Structure formats: C-alpha cells, structure tokens
Curated annotation (Swiss-Prot):
EC numbers for this chain: 2.7.8.13
Key words, A-Z: Cell cycle, Cell division, Cell inner membrane, Cell membrane, Cell shape, Cell wall biogenesis/degradation, Magnesium, Membrane, Metal-binding, Peptidoglycan synthesis, Transferase, Transmembrane, Transmembrane helix
Domain of life: Bacteria
First-listed, main subcellular location of the protein, grouped into a coarse class: membrane
Identification of the protein by name: Phospho-N-acetylmuramoyl-pentapeptide-transferase
Reactions it catalyzes: UDP-N-acetyl-alpha-D-muramoyl-L-alanyl-gamma-D-glutamyl-meso-2,6-diaminopimeloyl-D-alanyl-D-alanine + di-trans,octa-cis-undecaprenyl phosphate = di-trans,octa-cis-undecaprenyl diphospho-N-acetyl-alpha-D-muramoyl-L-alanyl-D-glutamyl-meso-2,6-diaminopimeloyl-D-alanyl-D-alanine + UMP
Gene name for this UniProt entry: mraY
Pfam families hit by this protein: Glycos_transf_4, MraY_sig1
Transmembrane segments: 27-47, 71-91, 93-113, 134-154, 174-194, 205-225, 245-265, 268-288, 294-314, 343-363
Record NCBIfam families: mraY (TIGR00445)
Entry keyword annotation includes Transport: no
Subcellular location: Cell inner membrane
Topology class, membrane: Multi-pass membrane protein
Family affiliation: Belongs to the glycosyltransferase 4 family. MraY subfamily.
Amino acid sequence: MLIWLVELSEYFKFLNLFRYITFRTGAALFTSALIVFLFGPTIINSLRIRQGKGQPIRADGPQTHFKKAGTPTMGGLMILAGIVGASLLWADLSNVYVVATLLVTLGFGAIGFYDDYLKVTKQSHKGFSGKARLGIEFVIAGIAVYFMMRTALASGTAGSTFGSSIAFPFFKDFLINLGIMFVVFGGFVIVGAGNAVNLTDGLDGLAIVPVMIAAASFGVIAYLAGNVVFANYLQINFVPGTGELAVVLGAVIGAGLGFLWFNAPPAAIFMGDTGSLALGGTIGTVAVATKHEIVMAIIGGLFVMETLSVIIQVGFFKMTGRRVFLMAPIHHHFEKKGWTESQVVIRFWIIAVGLALLGLSTLKLR
C-alpha cells in the first residue's frame, strides 16, 4: 500500500526508498515482528481464557508431552496478523502473485482455525473431516494457481506456454507444458506444502524455524526470478512480478521471529493448524509462482521427510500390521528412542539449514 506514495517522491525524495523491494522486504520483516510482539501477549491471554484445557495431548505420545497440557493453540492468529498486516502496508497489492499468495495464506489459515476450534471444543484430535479439508484446500489453491498461470502466460517472457509449464533445476530451457492441468499440479504442490508443515509442527519451535529458513530461501529465489538481469545471469526462468513476493516472505520471517519468542520452550502457545497450514501454503504458492516447485522439495526436504514417514508408517501398517517407526511423524520416533525434545528440534534445524543451502546451490548449477 505504501508503495503508492512513490508518486509523491517528486516532492519528498525519501519516498524513493519505497521503490526498492529490498527496503520494503526489510520493513515488512520488522513490521510483522513488531505486530506479533505487541499483540502476542493479549492474544495468548485471550486464547488461554477461552480454551480452558488448551490443545489436547495425544495419549499415545511421548510422556514428556503431558506437561504441556493446558497450553493454548491457534497461535497462528498472531502469525497471520503479522503477515497480512505487514504485507498490506509494504507489498504491491496490485500484483497478482501477492494477492494469490495472501489468498492462500488466509484461506488455509481459516481452514486451520476451524480445525483447531473443533479439536479444542471437543478435546479430541479429530477435527475437520480430512476429505472436506483437502477438498477446500484444493479449491483455494486451484484458484490461486489459475490466476498466477494466466498472469505468467500473459507475460510471454519465456514462450507462450511458460505459465502452464513445469521448470526443472539445472536446465533452464527444459519445460514440460501441462496446459490447464498445471492448475492441478500447482494445487497439489500448495496443498502438499501446507499439510507437510502441519505434520512437522509437533514440538516447540520445530516447524517455525525451518519455515523461516524456507521463506528466506524463497525470498532470494523470488527476488532473483523477478529481476531480468539476475535471472539471465543465473540462467533461471524470468517471471516478471514475482520479486514482489520477497516482501511477503519478509513478513513471514518477521512473524515467525515474533511467534518464536512465545513458542520457545516451554511454549506459551502453539501455532496449531491455523499457523502451520497457512505457512506451508504460503511457501508452496511462492514455489509455484517462481517455477521452483521441484527445488522446494529440496529446500523443504525436512517437511518432505516428515510427510513420508507418516505415509510409510500408515501404508506399512495396513499391509503388514506392523510399524516401521516407533511413532510417526518421525520427530516422535526419535523422542521415543530417547532424544530430548531440544535435541530433536535443534538437529532438525541443522538439517533444514543444510537442505536450504543445497536448494539454493541449484540456482548456480546450470
């Protein structure tokens, strides 16, 4: 919104700063963190009063988790407030990619909020119907992908079918055109990302730091892909307008830092599905917009690992009646093996950093 003040730069030279994505990204980070810091305590106290028993604790989970009983959930409301508030101030709201990303952020956040509400009121792990939840997620993601695809097709910078094509790392000109089916592919990427982060969010600080790492990585990718000079130099696909997504991701990082202040062990609040679905969906949307869906599987490899552990556990149990892991998602497996919560969290953070660096290195390998 504040970018519109650039028109007054003829009279106030300092307003030229608002032209620069880097400046607005930093400002969005600071603003979102400030929003969470300022309103966090009020939101936490309100949720604690309203929820009473807080988030239900799994009876079959690690024994150390029972001491967390009574901790309120829905902390994602703080994160959403920071992201949306900062984005409205600092991002270009006429940019289709920004609007599509915020649509997914808010839409997935609303789904997560309803899921959290059902779990808290029923004091049960069974919230929103899985099929209904996935169906609504696909509708929201599909709408976002459709409009982003149309925008990319209209730009025509890399051919008439670029917007509906999958790009591959290491090969700039190797594109597979999916046509209208790209909406399905993109929707799958976004929904998968949202639910992968949701599965990872099981320990204090476990999900939010890897999300910030992924957001920082994709902030770099979005900025480079949206700049024709850098894109040509690195031989990555130029996608006009995606640079503006760096501002939104700056807001994600700021909101994440603010939330981590309250989520650090012992957590005063959990983000719940409200936050995890929204954050994962946001990262997934940026990956689709920048044509780095495959690279997201590397940068977000930790989330992929968590998701695969659940798929393997459920599938193997249905076939054999036995379990591969002591408990899934896999972070609980390591807890059951005797790792402390802090050991699991910090070691997984290290993995996330390594995977992010590996993913970013693909930008130069052409």
